[in-house]
């Protein structure tokens, strides 16, 4: 199968992560995966949800949205509709779970970290790009808090990233574009840590059921892609 952008089945799209993209947040990046572009920012509040008061534990939560011009047809803002749509709710919960999985909140104190992921151009894989980019913004933010003496150490247990895999025209592909996603028989999103532990697997047969062997193949391919993304994260942060 020849992919639209001439990639092999096992290739990621070109990935670029620009740090310190905005002036005001504690951490911010623009992540570009092919034609998908997401701005990820990190802010902090000196308080925690009621269920954490008095525990000396921190918290992290996320919001996700798509700008009106991010899709071929104008996307109506959620605020105009009066409610967050189900897809956005699902994705922002996924982003929050993915990042909470690698943060040691006992070292944050009673503070809440806010992750905001805003899609400025959508061409497939916005949720996985948001997770991968938000981690870099989070690392930068925590490093700044440490530098300012607000926290004693960066409370990151390990790196985390995410990627999509799927089956299109009977072939297993890594990092689906929007065109491929629309034609996919199987669509899957995988979130994994640097040590190879899964945070989340979201997989659905859109048209044709898939076998156990195909599932294993997709998970192995996703792992390869995620390890490459973590390498890119580290290089972006100057750790490699």
Swiss-Prot record:
One of its GO terms (biological process) is tRNA processing. Phosphate binds at residues 87, 125-127. Pfam families: RNase_PH, RNase_PH_C. This is Ribonuclease PH. It comes from Dictyoglomus turgidum (strain DSM 6724 / Z-1310). The keyword Nucleotidyltransferase applies. The lineage of its organism: Bacteria, Pseudomonadati, Dictyoglomota, Dictyoglomia, Dictyoglomales. SUPFAM superfamilies: Ribonuclease PH domain 2-like (SSF55666), Ribosomal protein S5 domain 2-like (SSF54211). GO terms for molecular function: 3'-5'-RNA exonuclease activity; RNA binding; tRNA binding; tRNA nucleotidyltransferase activity. Belongs to the RNase PH family. The keyword rRNA processing applies. The gene is rph. It is an enzyme of class 2 (transferase). Homohexameric ring arranged as a trimer of dimers. Phosphorolytic 3'-5' exoribonuclease that plays an important role in tRNA 3'-end maturation. Removes nucleotide residues following the 3'-CCA terminus of tRNAs; can also add nucleotides to the ends of RNA molecules by using nucleoside diphosphates as substrates, but this may not be physiologically important. Probably plays a role in initiation of 16S rRNA degradation (leading to ribosome degradation) during starvation. Its EC number is 2.7.7.56. It catalyses: tRNA(n+1) + phosphate = tRNA(n) + a ribonucleoside 5'-diphosphate. HAMAP family: RNase_PH. Keywords: Nucleotidyltransferase, RNA-binding, rRNA processing, Transferase, tRNA processing, tRNA-binding.
